[in-house]
Regions:
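Aromatic-lined carbohydrate-binding/catalytic grooves of carbohydrate-active enzymes
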Residues: 294-319
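Lectin-like carbohydrate-binding module/patch detector with strong preference for beta-trefoil
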Residues: 119-253
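Cleavable N-terminal signal peptides of Sec/SRP-targeted secreted and luminal proteins
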Residues: 65-84, 574-586
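N-terminal carbohydrate-binding accessory modules
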Residues: 79-125, 250-296
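An active-site-proximal structural segment forming one wall of the substrate-binding cleft
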Residues: 278-296, 317-344, 357-393
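C-terminal GPI-anchoring signal of eukaryotic secretory precursors
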Residues: 562-574
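Extended, alpha-helix-rich binding/interface surfaces that flank or overlap catalytic cores
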Residues: 535-563
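Active-site region of glycoside hydrolase catalytic domains
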Residues: 90-95, 106, 252, 349-510, ...
Length: 589
């Protein structure tokens, strides 16, 4: 479209020039007669001579016109084929996420966690305790808020406790209702009644493989009594035989490996060493060169809320992400790549996942204190990068969950965040991520959040849902065309924010897919996601799981960026368009 506009803007100038120099002389033969007032030719001979001069002049000009027409036609055709509307004359966003870099995700680079002592007992790990003498599970009655018993044969949520790690051997236990186990004195009973943990809620864990002893900080051991109580009154030091102070510990889940887990697991000094090395090596200048050479024009950079307090963020977070983000902007400017800053991890966690730096899987973001702190982070980032030529946009929050984050709370936050960005940057896009979970895809389009350069981000994975588990390669491809494409088209036509597929991946649950199948699947996704009015961003640049790794996919030709049909106009159509364009231009010039 920009090419067409450019042609129309240029054409009248050239046409007027030709009209003045050439066409004007040809359109009125009497002007030619007036050039030689002393001529003895008859009027008929003069007319014939003028026509002969005109034909000679046309023969001289025709080759030049064809060359010019071909050049302009090719430029227009190239612009039509490789430019798009709706992004102020720029190409659509073809981006890659820098996931796992400034916000840690253990599954992206598991080796980061290799040297943590008691590495299977990180913050958020869910554990069960079973008395070896009673063969009953420890249970927080009603999930917490009351006393603790040792009387359940089959464990459920009441018997599941989340670890809050204090040190390698010291822990606090959070019940399913959010209350902490507490014991205020030697000989006292253990209850699940504390709102927040302190000394009385901290216990030592002595471990012998899957067996543990639990004791208070004063050294008194907890035991399961014959009356099914949990009391801090065991006499002496228990051995590892069958006794009332010994419990079998089962790890029910330990899926959280984020910034909180790595920093609190190693402790500050070792975590700083590990993360400093990671931030310097995981994404480098050469990665930006690679992206640029393969047609990527933007990066989406996840950051955590603690970046605003760099270089000395609150414990246990480790400083250094701000300097790394500055480097990314510098590299981006060098290679003409744009940056989207994405608040991926908000205080309190907006979704309970490791990539939001959740401590224990809880979604505690939606309160006034955390929301205000998040807005302060947006203010910090906007003021710092508003005038940087590499800034493309700021995403106010990544993947808030439904129903954990109520829509009205989210919309209010987005509106305030939009105003903050606009205070500093009139040209930056403000990006609102859809809620994940059970949410209406149209809900943000109905919310009327801002009216200038706004974008809605949605994430598409043929994963994370049992629906996709048994789909074949063909089924997955058809799902992209039959389900994703209509939704993208509907959102494109919603007369609201632009549409951004901010995360997608060339991976699925197909166990036997070969290279050709992955190529077809990738092509299908590119066909559809290229239709999004703002563009797309692949998740992620590097990953221990190769099909999630953008660079691996490109180098091994499992993802072919230039082969999707939406990136191409068939060659015969190109040729026809070029011919007709040149004929038309030659005619009007």
């Amino acid at each position: 479209m920009d090419g067409i506009h450019h042609m129309h803007a240029v054409h009248p100038i050239f046409h007027a020039t030709n009209g003045f120099l050439f066409a004007g002389a040809l359109s009125n033969p009497h002007q030619i007669l007036s050039r030689d007032p002393n001529s003895n030719l008859t009027p008929k001979e003069r007319t014939q001579e003028a026509e002969s001069d005109e034909r000679e002049e046309m023969r001289e000009k025709t080759p030049k016109r064809w060359v010019f027409a071909f050049a302009v036609g090719f430029f227009v055709l190239f612009s039509i084929a490789y430019s798009v509307e709706n992004l102020n004359g720029s190409p659509k966003v073809r981006a890659v996420n820098l996931g796992g870099w400034l916000v840690v995700e253990g599954w992206i680079k598991p080796s980061l966690f290799d040297d943590i002592p008691n590495g299977d007992m990180l913050d958020g790990t869910q554990v069960l305790f079973k008395s070896v003498t009673l063969q009953k599970y420890v249970s927080a009655v009603n999930g917490g808020g009351s006393y603790v018993t040792v009387d359940k044969d089959v464990p459920s949520s009441w018997e599941t406790f989340k670890l809050w790690r204090v040190s390698t051997t010291e822990f606090q236990f959070r019940s399913s209702s959010g209350k902490f186990l507490t014991c205020d004195s030697e000989g006292g009973s253990v209850s699940a009644t504390a709102e927040s943990p302190s000394t009385e809620e901290t216990f030592y864990i002595e471990r012998n493989r899957n067996e543990v002893h639990i004791k208070l900080l004063n050294g008194t051991y907890v035991q399961a009594t014959s009356s099914n109580q949990l009391l801090a009154n065991y006499q002496g030091v228990p051995g590892w035989d069958s006794n009332a102070a010994t419990f079998e510990m089962t790890i029910a889940a330990n899926g959280l490996h984020g910034d909180y887990q790595i920093a609190n697991g190693y402790g500050h000094d070792k975590a700083k060493e590990v993360l400093t090395k990671h931030r310097k090596s995981f994404v480098t200048r050469e990665d930006f060169r690679f992206l640029s050479e393969h047609g990527i024009n933007a990066v989406r950079i996840p950051v955590g809320w603690w970046i605003a307090q760099d270089p000395s963020p609150p414990a246990p977070y480790i400083g250094g992400t701000l300097a790394a983000l500055d480097r990314a902007f510098s590299w981006a400017q060098t290679f003409k790549i744009k940056c989207i800053i994405d608040l991926h991890a908000a205080p309190g966690s907006q979704n309970g996942m490791e990539h939001s730096a959740s401590r224990d899987g809880s979604t505690d973001w939606p309160n006034s204190e955390n929301i205000l702190q998040s807005l302060n982070v947006i203010d910090f980032l906007s003021s710092r990068y508003a005038n940087h030529p590499a800034l493309l946009g700021i995403e106010l929050l990544n993947e808030p969950s439904a129903p954990g984050v109520p829509l009205d709370v989210l919309v209010s936050y987005y509106w305030k965040g939009y105003q903050i960005v606009r205070k500093y940057a009139s040209e930056a896009y403000v990006i609102f991520c859809q809620r994940i979970g059970n949410a209406d895809p149209m809900e943000l389009y109905k919310a009327n959040i801002g009216d200038v350069k706004t974008v809605v981000d949605l994430h598409y994975y043929n994963l994370f849902d049992a629906f996709f588990n048994n789909l074949s390669a063909t089924d997955n491809i058809q799902f992209v065309y039959n389900n994703r494409q209509p939704q993208v088209q509907t959102l494109n036509n919603a007369n609201g924010p632009l549409v951004f597929i901010g995360e997608w991946v060339n991976e699925w649950s197909v166990s036997n897919g070969d290279q050709a199948a992955y190529q077809q699947y990738g092509n299908a996704q590119l066909d559809v996601y290229n239709e999004a009015s703002f563009g797309w961003s692949y998740w992620t640049i590097k990953n221990a799981r190769k099909h999630w790794d953008f660079e691996w996919n490109i180098l091994n030709k499992y993802l072919l960026l230039e082969s999707s049909s939406s990136n191409q106009i068939p060659s015969n159509c190109l040729l026809l368009m070029l011919v007709f364009g040149c004929l038309y231009l030659h005619h009007i010039l």
